[in-house]
Amino acid sequence: MERFLENVMYASRWLLAPVYFGLSLALIALALKFFQEILHVLPNVFALAEADLILVLLSLVDMTLVGGLLVMVMFSGYENFVSQLDISAGKEKLNWLGKMDATSLKNKVAASIVAISSIHLLRVFMDAKNVPDNKLMWYVIIHLTFVLSAFVMGYLDRLTRHNH
């Protein structure tokens, strides 16, 4: 009975495979939105004010960072929790595949969230005259919470690795 339960539990990891595949569909949706934004801005690029163009560019950078985060979570999560990715010899392989454990993935996700939050906060500050002060305050508080969380996770990881 114990062996049966263990085998079922171990096989249940494959329930995550469609979730990771769903992230690839989310990446397609993000890419479509990215190019929609490019197609929207290009015809009007000469009519846009510099600040408005910078806001659009920050939005594109933000989407790019989110896309990188999706790829990192999708591949590393699949490799850590479902199965090793078997990339054919001779095909291009990302050099970090198979080298990122759950802890390093968590730290990279935290760093990515801080970067995404920084870009978002910069976009908000570029339009600060149209954002109420209390909303600005909450954006900063939330961003600082992300920064502090990432710092604490990195510090705890360093302590854990140092003690082992």
From Swiss-Prot:
Its main location: membrane. The keyword Nucleotide-binding does not apply. Belongs to the UPF0114 family. It is found in: Cell membrane. One of its GO terms (cellular component) is plasma membrane. Keywords: Cell membrane, Membrane, Transmembrane, Transmembrane helix. The gene is yqhA. NCBIfam families: HI0507 (TIGR00645). The keyword Hydrolase does not apply. The chain crosses the membrane at residues 10-32, 53-75, 136-155. This is UPF0114 protein YqhA. InterPro entries: UPF0114, UPF0114_bac. It is a multi-pass membrane protein. Pfam families: UPF0114.
